[in-house]
Regions:
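Carrier-protein-dependent adenylate-forming modules in NRPS/ANL systems
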Residues: 1-91, 138, 163, 167, ...
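Adenylate-forming
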Residues: 23-31, 36-45, 55-59, 74-79, ...
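C-terminal membrane module of polytopic membrane proteins
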Residues: 115-116
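Short, highly charged C-terminal tails/helix-capping segments
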Residues: 366-378
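Internal, well-ordered interaction modules that form the hydrophobic cores of assembly/scaffold domains
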Residues: 377-380, 441
Length: 561
């Protein structure tokens, strides 16, 4: 068997540059055709401090693997200090043994009695009609192709919250993970993600203790679907999560990649299939690194990448006596769609939501307050401060001011007809004078029964210029509805055209715009702007402008002025 050695590169650094150096090498991209999937860098920060960065490709190791890898490193260092070869304990199994065992466990999917077939069928049912994409509160639209650039915001829950989570978990026969999953799902639902919240979660996949000390990729990803419908209490939501998760854990052997092949969801280069939010609870054993002559401390590493839109990565801490000491971690987010400030606020919202629901688990999740006082004030007052100073001028005057500014600009386009502001204004002035001559003015109504057209805009403006209020009537209304509206509103006249098809009651006073006599009178009328001296009363913002009648679905139509 040909042995391969991992590349180890020695570099100089200093305290100002070390964080950037670590981040840079952590994002190393392996060429798996020519490189082994493990690489290391040793940075000399100063005479007394060095930083070792080991990067393992996921094909060769998972998060759990870092423990045995660190222990093997400590054994090797101690041996080399003594000038001897490392005396590693032989492993009971190799990764190849695991792959053969898994293949044997799943069996043939074509065999309906096999474990693989039954688990695939479970996931077909469990994930039926799952949302293709979770509508999260993005800061910008998702790109067509994801860049996978990411960042992390720290997340920490104090001892009080940790105790509350543990207590509720024990009370409901659930795990800490399940309580946190319910909290994340409740938050996302409150932020507009809907009532069906799929969350991806890794499982260690080491179902035999013989695998505990083996470096390799055993992790599988489960899609945990959280039902937040019906406004449940948080306690009820935890119970729902518990039932869903226990079912899913019983079918955790089918690889996620195989599920994607079988379920064949709508694919996109811009997002992850089946879920876009992940929740990981780190419970791998932590190894204390002991190396002769060295003080060793494990530090955080980051790749600057994000596989999902959001990934909540958490871990519990305990005191030496086993007492809860807090839950900490971070929210990894895709910078394609989120700003850091949004995720910082989200971390605060999750903390406040947990504090609220732990204090009263029977409280519906919809009633848990998640906003800070300043945020609540912004929502209730700042964004609702819609007061604006309005001009004292009425619509006809405002329109005439626009005519003065852009007389030849296009004002109306309809069915191939284009009219400028000047044309609309002059024709409306003529019709307004005709209406005033027939008694139109403030506190009077003029009904308009015309199809949608450029002419309709002129008519409505003319009624307003006269000082009267218009009553719109759809020519397609039933005759009895039209009769009722006219009887209730009592307009001085109905403006219409000959081909409108409207059925008006006998004796209704009407103005037919396309009647030759009307056309002649309009042509002989002045087109300049009207003055209050010509009107029966002054225009003002306190006189009626129009009357809209309700549908009448619950009785008779009612006019709203």
């Amino acid at each position: 068997v040909e042995e391969a050695a991992a590349a180890v590169e020695l570099r100089k650094s200093d305290r100002e540059r070390i964080s950037a150096d670590v981040e840079s090498v952590s994002a190393y991209a392996f060429d798996l055709q020519s490189e082994i999937p493990l690489r290391a860098w040793l940075f000399e920060v100063d005479a007394d401090d060095s930083v070792l960065v080991a990067v393992v490709h996921h094909i060769a190791g998972d998060g759990w693997s870092l423990g045995p890898l660190a222990r093997d490193l400590a054994v090797a260092y101690a041996a080399r200090c003594e000038g001897v070869a490392p005396g590693w304990e032989p492993l009971p199994v190799q990764y190849a043994d695991y792959t053969l065992w898994q293949r044997e466990l799943l069996g043939d999917e074509d065999d309906s009695e096999s474990v693989g077939a039954s688990q695939v069928e479970f996931w077909r049912r469990e994930l039926a009609d799952i949302p293709d994409e979770l509508p999260l509160p993005f800061d910008r639209s998702r790109p067509v192709v994801a860049s996978y650039a990411g960042d992390v915001v720290e997340l920490a829950f104090d001892v009080r919250v940790h105790r509350g989570v543990l207590g509720l978990a024990r009370e409901r026969g659930a795990s800490v993970f399940m309580v946190m999953q319910a909290a994340v799902a409740a938050l996302l639902s409150r932020l507009g993600a809907g009532e069906d919240i799929p969350i991806g979660s890794p499982v260690a996949g080491r179902l035999d203790e013989a695998l505990d000390d083996l470096v390799g990729f055993f992790v599988n990803t489960l899609v945990l679907r959280t039902d937040v419908s019906g406004d449940p209490s948080f306690a009820e939501l935890v119970e729902r999560v518990r039932e869903t998760d226990l079912r899913a854990f019983g079918a955790q052997d089918v690889p996620f990649e195989r599920l994607v092949e079988v379920l064949n969801p709508v694919r996109s280069m811009g997002r992850h299939p089946l879920f876009q939010v992940a929740l990981a609870f780190q419970n791998a054993p932590v190894s204390d690194l002991v190396m002769p002559g060295l003080e060793v401390e494990a530090g955080p590493g980051g790749t600057g990448a994000a596989k999902f839109d959001l990934s909540f990565n958490l871990a519990e801490s305990f005191t030496g006596s086993g007492e809860p000491a807090g839950i900490s971690g971070g929210i990894e987010f895709a910078t394609d769609v989120f700003d850091r400030s949004t995720i910082e606020r989200m971390a605060g919202w999750l903390t406040r939501l947990l504090e609220q629901v732990l204090a009263d688990p029977q409280r519906p999740v919809s009633r848990a307050r998640i906003l800070e006082d300043t945020e609540l004030d912004q929502v209730l007052k700042g964004w609702n401060d819609t007061h604006r100073a309005t001009p004292g001028a009425v619509l006809p005057v405002l329109f005439e001011a626009q005519v003065a500014r852009t007389p030849d600009a296009v004002a109306v386009v309809c069915d191939g007809v284009e009219l400028s502001y000047r044309e609309v204004n002059e024709r409306a002035n003529r019709l307004a004078r005709l209406l005033i001559g027939q008694g139109a003015g403030p506190e009077r109504f003029v009904a308009v029964a015309m199809p949608r057209s450029a002419e309709l805009v002129i008519v409505l403006l003319a009624v307003l210029k006269s000082g009267a209020a218009y009553v719109p009537i759809d020519p397609d209304y039933p005759a009895d509805r039209i009769a009722y509206i006219l009887d209730d509103a009592d307009p001085m006249a109905v403006i219409t055209v000959g081909n409108s098809g409207v059925e008006l009651p006998a004796g209704t006073s009407r103005i037919l715009l396309d009647e030759p006599g009307t056309v002649a009178r309009l042509a002989a009328t002045g087109a300049e702007n009207l003055t209050d001296a010509e009107r029966l009363g002054s225009l003002g913002g306190d006189v009626p402008a129009y009357v809209i009648f309700t549908s009448g679905s619950t009785g008779r139509p009612k006019g709203v002025v």
